[in-house]
Amino acid sequence: NEKVTVVGPKKSQANVSILGPFRSKSQVELSATDARSLGLNAPVRLSGDLAGSAPCKLVGPAGEVELAEGVIVAKRHLHISAAEAEKANVANGEVIMVKITSADRSLIFDDVEVRIGEGCDATMHVDTDESNAAGCTSATVGELIKK
């Protein structure tokens, strides 16, 4: 349960969790709101696509490091197993839509990229801005819509 502080040109954000998996380059995923509040112009990208992304400083208990690039707003995506993908008739890298029905804030997310991998149930990854916009909870279920 390690935490760091992300430092941008305008301010800092403390207690940011470090998550796996380990990657060859350091990566920071922020919501668009958090990136803007730090003064960072973070592009919307899939994990690992860091070329030309925003810089920042990371400060932790063992010291600090300047990242020349590595800050992104994570592109919304759907993790799904090969069996579930076959049943839903979607392919890895395909862009779909997902309809979220909630009490007060139902909406359709467009530009959701499918990421097929074993060992995962269908799980959509959105940031806190997107989750709040749709009124999502941990029990929210979405409907996959092909484009």
Task: Name each model feature, range by range.
Residues 1-9, 15-61, 66-94, 99, ...:
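Short beta-strand-centered segments at strand-helix junctions
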Residues 64, 102-106, 147:
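Short, charged beta-turn/beta-strand-edge "cap" motif at the junction between a beta-strand
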